Amino acid sequence: MSKEKFERTKPHVNVGTIGHVDHGKTTLTAAICTTLAKVYGGEAKDFASIDNAPEERERGITIATSHVEYDTPSRHYAHVDCPGHADYVKNMITGAAQMDGGILVVAATDGPMPQTREHILLGRQVGIPYIIVFMNKCDMVDDEELLELVEMEVRELLSEYDFPGDDLPVIQGSALGALNGEEQWEAKIVELAEALDTYIPEPERAVDQPFLMPIEDVFSIQGRGTVVTGRIERGILTVGDEVAIVGIKDTTTTTCTGVEMFRKLLDEGRAGENVGALLRGTKRDEVERGQVLAKPGSITPHTKFESEVYVLSKEEGGRHTPFFKGYRPQFYFRTTDVTGDISLPEGVEMVMPGDNIQMVVELIAPIAMDEGLRFAIREGGRTVGAGVVAKIFE
């Protein structure tokens, strides 16, 4: 057992396999674990244990996902693999498994198929920043020209969705060959691991990003002023910092004159901590739940955006009937509901429970948002959908 396994000092990167059904995503996941365990040490995982993915509930949505881990000399990877297409759709939209990069698996025997395209589109919509291609089953194709053709098709398809199709790494391999211990194919898995190490940049840690805290509660403390509480999502809040209050109303700025946690006064609060922030000269009725406290200029409020939405099925506790244009549910962002109008893509009349759909949403009040922000769709407090902001309009 190599000592490396227990050192958590290496950078941690989240990846996952995406691509068409039966193109070998799970076989590749097993091949990566097995080959890298052999080469660098770590724990091998077989196909059956990965394929038998447990169901998880993320915001009431049932998703089957397998989580595996593996190491390269310079990094520790957490990798997600889903058994079914619907699981991928839900996973990507809810952000249940955030990916710093995706491994797109395309069988050389088939080339790009409908779900290949759909996963690339979803990756673009939900903001997967980097994609590496693993062309699988290359041991089944004798014709070198055919391999080149498939590679070209995949690159063109990625470019169509604004990924750098000409420049991203494409590895031609055989997951099954590697799993069976054939050296030429194991070498391709190592090549894939090297591509992960070099092509996907180390993700910026939450604590290094600009400060943001969704406001959950507001108190006024006699003689001290107004305190807002919440969990810091990213960055650091230091006493004396200027902060903006963004969303719902016009943006205002003020100074944080105190940070407290568990009734103790601190100099700062960091990402992941639940804190109270004392705001200078702010009145109790000028701030409300649903707004965010943020580094000035780092985030802006918006009302209109394009989103990718998964509509819960009846079995997941969602609607029993479809909805049509003119539907006006609540959109739950971070800590609060805001009513919004939707418009459906051209030619789409209705949306059935269990569908995923692109829709443009116009909220009745602005919310602090960036592309990639997740939200829930609710009717009277019951979740009926999950979505992600794909593109901001105004």
Curated annotation (Swiss-Prot):
Region G3, annotated ranges: 81-84
GO molecular-function terms, A-Z: GTP binding; GTPase activity; guanosine tetraphosphate binding; translation elongation factor activity
Residues annotated as binding Mg(2+): 26
Transmembrane feature ranges: none
Region (G1): 19-26
Protein's cellular compartments: Cytoplasm
Region annotated G5, chain positions: 174-176
Catalytic activity: GTP + H2O = GDP + phosphate + H(+)
UniProt keyword terms in alphabetical order: Cytoplasm, Elongation factor, GTP-binding, Hydrolase, Magnesium, Metal-binding, Nucleotide-binding, Protein biosynthesis
Enzyme class: hydrolase
EC number(s) recorded for this UniProt protein: 3.6.5.3
Region (G2): 60-64
HAMAP family: EF_Tu_B (MF_00118_B)
PANTHER family listed in its UniProt record: ELONGATION FACTOR TU, MITOCHONDRIAL, ELONGATION FACTOR TU-RELATED
Function: GTP hydrolase that promotes the GTP-dependent binding of aminoacyl-tRNA to the A-site of ribosomes during protein biosynthesis.
Subunit structure as annotated in this protein's UniProt entry: Monomer.
Protein name: Elongation factor Tu
